[in-house]
C-alpha cells in the first residue's frame, strides 16, 4: 500500500454516497436473480442461469469501469428484453447518445450473444447547441451547462468497448442526429435513446420509429421528466407524424422497478441524492395508449346504474 504524500488532504467522508454504494453492492445478488428471471427468454440463445448470472456480473463490473449516465441494472433490463425477442426476428440494436460508452459496452455484450449488430449514433462532441423552442435545452444551458459538455471522443468510446465489451458487433456513426439518423438503414428490434433534449428526441422518433419492428422496444433514459416523456402519450404528435395512436411509456416519472430505493421523480436531479433514480422506461411498437371511454357521450350509458338502484 503506497504511503500518503505529506500534506495530502484526506477526502471527506460522504455518508449518503457510502450508503448508496453499500446498498447497491449488498442488493446485487438479489437484483441479479430477479432482473434475469424470465420464462420468455428463447432457448436458442442458450442463456442458462449461470450464463445469466455471469452476464449480470459483467454489467455490474463494467459500471465501475466506464462512465455512464444509466445504471447497470437498467442495462440488464434491456438485455433481458432483447433475449425475449425471437432470433428469427431480424433487426439491429440502436443506441443514440453514448457519452463515454458505459451503456455501449454492456449492450455490445448482449448483442454478441444474440447475434445482432449494435449501431451507435453520437456527435462525439457533447451536448448540441440549443434549438429554438426546446425548453429542456434552454433550461439546461441556463443552469450552467455548455454545448460540448458530456462529450466522449470516438477513440475513447471505441477503446472502452474494445477493452470491456464486444467491438466486432458495433458500428459507430459520428455526427448530429439531424444529419446522421435520416440515413439509417435496416430494421431495429431495440433502441436506447439517451438524448436529453426535445429536439434530439424528435429526431430519433421521426427517423427511427418507422424502422422499429412490430413489438420492438424503445428505451428512454429521461423518464424522470414527465413533460419530456409526454410525447409518448400525445395523440396530436403521433397522428401528425405517424398517423397512429401513441404507444405510451412504461415507467414514466419513476422508471421500471430495478430494486433501487426511489421515492420522488425530482430526486435524481438534486438533493437528496441518496434517493437518486437509477432506472429506465420503455415502450413497445404496436401498443396503444389512448383513452376511449367517454360515458357522457352515450345515451343509455351502460356505466349508469339501473333506475331501481339509483332510487
Language model features with spans:
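Boundary detector for helix-to-coil junctions that initiate low-complexity/charged tails
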Residues: 1-41
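An N-terminal domain-start capping segment
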Residues: 20-21, 25, 80-88, 92-95, ...
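S-adenosylmethionine/decaboxylated-SAM
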Residues: 52-67, 90-311
Amino acid at each position: 500500500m503506497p504511503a500518503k504524500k505529506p500534506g495530502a488532504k484526506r477526502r471527506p467522508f460522504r455518508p449518503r454516497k457510502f450508503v448508496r454504494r453499500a446498498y447497491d453492492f449488498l442488493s446485487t445478488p438479489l437484483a441479479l436473480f430477479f432482473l434475469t428471471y424470465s420464462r420468455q427468454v428463447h432457448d436458442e440463445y442458450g442463456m442458462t442461469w449461470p450464463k445469466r448470472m455471469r452476464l449480470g456480473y459483467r454489467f455490474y463490473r463494467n459500471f465501475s469501469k466506464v462512465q455512464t449516465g444509466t445504471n447497470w441494472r437498467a442495462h440488464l433490463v434491456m438485455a433481458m428484453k432483447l433475449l425475449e425477442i425471437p432470433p428469427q426476428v431480424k433487426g439491429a440494436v440502436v443506441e443514440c447518445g453514448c457519452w463515454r460508452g458505459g451503456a455501449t459496452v454492456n449492450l455490445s455484450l448482449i448483442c454478441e450473444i444474440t447475434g445482432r449488430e449494435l449501431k451507435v449514433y453520437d456527435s462525439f462532441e457533447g451536448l448540441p447547441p440549443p434549438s429554438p423552442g426546446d425548453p429542456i435545452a434552454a433550461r439546461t444551458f441556463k443552469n450552467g451547462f455548455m454545448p460540448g459538455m458530456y462529450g466522449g471522443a470516438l477513440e475513447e468510446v471505441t477503446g472502452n468497448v474494445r477493452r470491456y465489451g464486444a467491438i466486432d458487433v458495433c458500428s459507430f456513426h459520428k455526427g448530429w442526429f439531424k444529419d446522421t439518423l435520416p440515413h439509417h438503414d435496416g430494421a431495429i428490434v431495440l433502441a436506447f435513446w439517451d438524448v436529453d433534449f426535445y429536439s434530439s428526441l424528435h429526431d430519433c422518433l421521426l427517423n427511427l420509429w418507422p424502422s422499429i419492428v412490430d413489438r420492438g422496444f424503445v428505451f428512454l433514459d429521461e423518464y424522470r421528466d414527465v413533460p419530456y416523456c409526454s410525447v409518448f402519450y400525445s395523440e396530436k404528435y403521433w397522428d401528425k407524424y405517424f398517423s397512429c395512436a401513441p404507444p405510451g411509456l412504461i415507467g414514466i416519472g419513476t422508471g421500471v422497478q430495478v430494486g433501487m430505493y426511489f421515492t420522488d421523480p425530482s430526486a435524481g436531479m438534486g438533493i437528496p441524492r441518496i434517493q437518486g433514480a437509477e432506472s429506465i422506461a420503455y415502450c413497445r411498437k404496436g401498443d396503444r395508449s389512448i383513452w376511449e371511454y367517454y360515458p357522457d357521450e352515450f345515451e343509455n350509458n351502460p356505466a349508469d346504474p339501473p333506475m331501481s338502484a339509483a332510487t
